[in-house]
A protein has these predicted regions:
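Charged, low-complexity intrinsically disordered terminal regions and linker tails
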Residues: 1-225
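Aromatic-residue detector
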Residues: 86, 99, 114, 238-239, ...
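Generic alpha-helical structural element
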Residues: 179-182, 234, 249
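Generic hydrophobic/packing signal
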Residues: 204, 208-213, 217, 235-236, ...
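Intrinsically disordered, low-complexity regulatory regions enriched in Ser/Pro/Gly/Thr
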Residues: 227-228, 252
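Short amphipathic alpha-helix starts
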Residues: 229-246
Length: 280
């Protein structure tokens, strides 16, 4: 975003690049840490920049502290280069960073930031020195790598029946684990399911248990669907015919039912053995 370099904020902080990250940090420090009342406005707008400048002018002690903090507390952009711009990863990381830092930021400006920007803002606002932040971010990277490994638990969902399986999974969870689904949006595809479990608090063992039960429900449902398409018949075969049926089933590695099905359909198609009845 292009801004006027001669605005009040540039005058108040000469030599600063005043990137959106820095402007957001200044605003959030003043609002959240210093408890200075600020009027809501758009991120990095001239109105925001002027409000920050006036607040700093009224509080020179705060200004001096921020100048020192910028060089000792803000990690370089390169430290966050591994964080994706959007998607599951930055959302999970931001949630974890919120827990790690203990910061609960209610600012409307913070809510307008992307998940990645929120992650960076949390680290910027966290009252720790450069080295501690660097170590915490490195551990967070490792935690994400470990967390993402659990995606394998849900590989069963990835096929042509993905949406149907996800619908069944949501239905099962809603009925059997209402605590997890309360106030959550129903998921309809695998990516949404993964994001749901990112923030569910469920352990890998619990996830595996849930998937196993959902798979059983799926198998039961499929068995019932197939049963609707079939009808059971009970009939008596002579012992000699029964023996032949067993022999055919064994030779062709088929079930007795499958042998009968193939013979009947074959006769219908080729008319080799049953004589046609004369029409009346």
């Amino acid at each position: 975003m292009i801004v006027n370099e001669m605005d009040l904020l540039s005058d108040e902080l000469p030599g600063w690049g005043l990137t959106e990250r820095e402007v957001a940090w200044l605003w959030l420090v003043l609002e959240s840490r210093e408890r200075i009342q600020m009027d809501e406005c758009q991120l990095n707008s001239q109105t925001m920049r002027n409000q920050i400048a006036r607040a700093l002018r009224r509080n020179p002690r705060v200004t001096r502290g921020l100048v020192r903090a910028r060089d000792s507390e803000l990690l370089p952009e390169e430290a966050f280069s591994w964080v994706e711009k959007s998607g599951r990863q930055p959302k999970w990381l931001a949630a974890q960073a919120g827990n790690k830092t203990g910061l609960r930021i209610r600012s409307s400006v913070f809510r307008t930031l992307t998940d990645r920007e929120q992650l960076i803002a949390l680290f910027d606002l966290w009252d720790r020195d450069f080295g501690q932040k660097e170590s915490a971010l490195k551990r967070l990277s490792g935690a994400w790598t470990e967390h993402a490994r659990s995606d394998r638990i849900f590989s069963w969902f990835k096929d042509k029946d993905e949406r149907t399986k996800c619908a069944l999974a949501w239905s099962w969870l809603e009925k059997n684990k209402p605590r997890l689904t309360w106030r959550a949006e129903p998921f309809t595809k695998l990516t949404e399911l993964l994001e749901f479990f990112d923030h569910s608090g469920a352990s890998d063992e619990e996830k595996e248990l849930y998937v196993d039960k959902i798979k059983r429900r799926w198998s039961t449902q499929k068995t019932r669907e197939k049963a609707v398409e079939k009808k059971q018949y009970n009939f008596v075969l002579p012992l000699s015919v029964n023996a032949v049926l067993d022999k055919l089933a064994e030779e062709h590695q088929l079930s007795r039912t499958k042998v009968l099905e193939m013979l009947i359909l074959g006769e219908e198609q080729h008319e080799l053995y049953l004589p046609k009845q004369p029409s009346r």
